[in-house]
Structure formats: structure tokens, C-alpha cells
């Protein structure tokens, strides 16, 4: 029901609190699931106080119940346990605080947990979070390895010692977190996000040395699975629990059976790599020697041929052939030049004999009128007294027509 309010007609805080309490009262009793993060049982008190938390969304709510309700499950429930409670929501108006009053509390059994994990597994698989094509390859030689593990844990020691034994120069960026219990999910998620944000981190290892199914529940939490799926950095899961692998094993880019196995898969062994380099050098040396031996045999075979016993003989034979060809060329060229010279002399003699200069040398003269016209007959000589130019072999002179 919408409330008709305005800045001029607001509702008092008490009225708002009363209305909220009325809405909550109409909810009735509901079943709620969560993880017990705080448990307070005061001696002599008839009421037990609990805090239920949803680890996937980091939301908590206070729960109260009568001691006789809690005593029925007190031996099997501790902080960190998952329970379902039948409770009536209550609104405490003076403080504006919501709480639950439980009338029944039941621990969540391992069988039920496994069923829920299987359902979550199928749901995430349907989204493609476990697909092989999403897996990122690990670098051959990471310069900086991010490690998420419990403080001073065997898992931390196994990863650090084995990795440094294999490759002493490897460096680690370690984030110590809770690896079980109510705070594990939030701390592991934060650590993974911090390491993924560091550009120099080449690979992230999330390690824990095994444990019960209940202890490993944080590593199947949906929030953590989605965080790992969103990482740009390759992630290695090293939880170390073979029968029932947590969902982290499926979303990680590589699964290691134990923290020690993770160290072996993350960094190469310096001894093995040196041996591999030596093997490659030996193989290259054998290949080069084989090539040299083959070329030496080929050279020896070539030198053993008859032509190579007296190599100058081929040159001498070709030199004689060249000399013969040069002599022949000189003779042919000389003959051609002599014939050309004879033909040129003959042609020159004919040209000279046909030249007007030869006629003039025999005493003849050529008469030309002043306009250059050659006189070929007496009629062309012109009138008496007209000058003519006479050309002879040694020059020319002027004459005049006489009658």
C-alpha cells in the first residue's frame, strides 16, 4: 500500500517504524538457511543468540531462540555450521532492527549439501564457466606467483619450498586468509581479486591441504567460483581433496592434486631444464658433425676423380683451343680487311676518274656566266664583250666574249 506523504506532510519515525513492523508481522513464519557466524549461550539465560550469514552475499541477520530449541542440536552445531531455521521475523521498533525468532533449528546434512553442490555445479556448467576453451595456459616460467593459503599452513610451506627447490629465482606474492569457516569465502575472494589486479603476477595458486567436505565448502561457493572465472590471470586450484573435488577445481585453469603438485606444475625444474638444454646442445653438435662428415666425404670423392688428379690439364687444353681460335680469327679478320681495302681503292679510283677535277687536270676549263650558268654552246656565251668566268684545275679567271 503506497503512502501519501510529502515534504509538508511527512511521517514521523515512530509511524514509519510501526508500519514496517506491521508489514513484517504479516510475513508469518518462514524457513531460512544460513551459516552460523556467532553463537552466544549465556549461563542461566533462557534465550540463545545467533547470527546467520549468507556467505554468497555477505548478509547477516540476528536470530534468537529459546534454550530448549537450541539444546536439541547443540551437540552437532557450532560456529561455521550451516542450518535451516523456522523463524518468525520480528521488528524491534525502538532501534529499527530486524531479527528472527526461531522455533526450530536443523543442521544441514552432508547429503543435502552435496545435492545442492551438484545443482550449483550443473547451473554453472550450463553457463559455460567450466568449459575447456575458457582455460588460460600457464606461463612457462612465471616471474611472480600469487599464493592464497592459510597462515603458516602446511600448504603454504609445501608450495614455497617445492617451488623454490625447483626454480630458486621464483618470487611469491602471498595472501594469507582463512581457508575454512565463516570468513573464508570473503577473504579468499578478496585475496584473489587483489592478486589478479597486480600486473606483475603471472599465475595465482589457491592452496589448502585437504579437509572434510564441510571444511572445503568455501571453495565451492558461487561467489568464489565467479570471481575465479572472471580473472585475467591463470588460476591453479590446489585444494588437495580427491574423492569430492570442490567446484574451484572445475573453474580453475589448472587443477593440482596437492599443494606440492601445484608447485611442480607452476614452475619448471631447473635441473631438468639444464639437462634438456644439454641434450639439445648434444643433438645440435651431432647434427653439425654429421653435416661436416658428409661434406668431407663428398669433397674426398670429388678430389678422387681423374680430372682432379691433374686439374691444370683442363686449363692447358682449353688454352690451346683458345690460341687456335684466336689465330683463326686473326687470319679471317686480316683477309676481310685486305678485301675491304682493295674494294675501297677500286671504288676510290672510279670516283676520281669520274670527278670533274680529273677532266680539268687534263687542260679543260668550265665557262660560267655571271649568274653561274654553265656555258655549253657558243649561243650560250652571250653578247660580245660579256665577261665569263673560266674555272681550271688550279683556280679560275675572267674572259670576255669576242665576236
Swiss-Prot record:
<dbReference type="GO" id="GO:0005737">
    <property type="term" value="C:cytoplasm"/>
</dbReference>
<dbReference type="InterPro" id="IPR025824">
    <property type="entry name" value="OB-fold_nuc-bd_dom"/>
</dbReference>
<keyword id="KW-0540">Nuclease</keyword>
<comment type="similarity">
    <text>Belongs to the XseA family.</text>
</comment>
<dbReference type="Pfam" id="PF13742">
    <property type="entry name" value="tRNA_anti_2"/>
</dbReference>
<dbReference type="Pfam" id="PF02601">
    <property type="entry name" value="Exonuc_VII_L"/>
</dbReference>
<comment type="subunit">
    <text>Heterooligomer composed of large and small subunits.</text>
</comment>
<dbReference type="GO" id="GO:0003676">
    <property type="term" value="F:nucleic acid binding"/>
</dbReference>
<protein>
    <recommendedName>
        <fullName>Exodeoxyribonuclease 7 large subunit</fullName>
        <ecNumber>3.1.11.6</ecNumber>
    </recommendedName>
</protein>
<keyword id="KW-0963">Cytoplasm</keyword>
<dbReference type="InterPro" id="IPR020579">
    <property type="entry name" value="Exonuc_VII_lsu_C"/>
</dbReference>
<dbReference type="GO" id="GO:0009318">
    <property type="term" value="C:exodeoxyribonuclease VII complex"/>
</dbReference>
<comment type="function">
    <text>Bidirectionally degrades single-stranded DNA into large acid-insoluble oligonucleotides, which are then degraded further into small acid-soluble oligonucleotides.</text>
</comment>
<dbReference type="GO" id="GO:0006308">
    <property type="term" value="P:DNA catabolic process"/>
</dbReference>
<dbReference type="GO" id="GO:0008855">
    <property type="term" value="F:exodeoxyribonuclease VII activity"/>
</dbReference>
<keyword id="KW-0378">Hydrolase</keyword>
<dbReference type="InterPro" id="IPR003753">
    <property type="entry name" value="Exonuc_VII_L"/>
</dbReference>
<keyword id="KW-0269">Exonuclease</keyword>
